[in-house]
């Protein structure tokens, strides 16, 4: 079943982007320009409507997850030569944000960012996407009503609706921020044939982050040194890129894109020092993404290390803390 049947009921869609074919199972995003003025769909025929600068195509659709959550799929295609961002944009830029309005009893989770490109762009560190990317926002029922929470019979209100308001920065020589808006009846119709595995699966040709525990990766933080070890899964290249954690600063030279690891047989090891730990309520001490191989479709692992207890000399991380429930690798 596709979303084409409900496209006519979408109250928030103002236009389809000029010259861009919109998939039949997707809701095209209404566009508000950088100045905050909504584009007027009646001002010109389809072929003459202006595109959002820096974004060639955008749409929203629904998929289902293997853990029985629904997933809002935000599909963004940058204009050739432009790019959009990962959760840590690198030296400049901003990650996109997705604000969902949902009926009572439903809650949106944290956005899942697929594996990004990690490279130098115009002399700066860049983490993001220069080709089409699909950001995933899981949505779960939290009130426990009904034996089948996905049944349309459990709809709390005949007039219930969903709405998403996304802000997406796209950059080339300069940057623009576009607000993309879409919505429709609740519950939505999910795209047929989707069974997305958020933990270590793939979507849209890009790997989705696995947890350290599921990937068999162990990490420790002792004094100011982070050590990450795990199975290499047949690759000869392993790198670590930092997440956007306030206060966390790696002890690497300016302009370093990623920390390179070493591969020995079927295992890898990444080691680096920290200048400072992550700070703020609920923030981990260290977080980032382990990239196995070089292709966007190859595995990646999301790694977090909680704040350890300070040692007797006041040095942070004096008591090493594992990042997963796996036992430390044997020496």
Q: How would you label these PLM feature ranges?
A:
Residues 18-19:
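N-terminal signal peptide c-region/cleavage motif recognized by signal peptidases
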Residues 1-10:
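Bacterial N-terminal signal peptides that target proteins for export
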Residues 23-331:
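Extracellular/lumen-exposed scaffold segments
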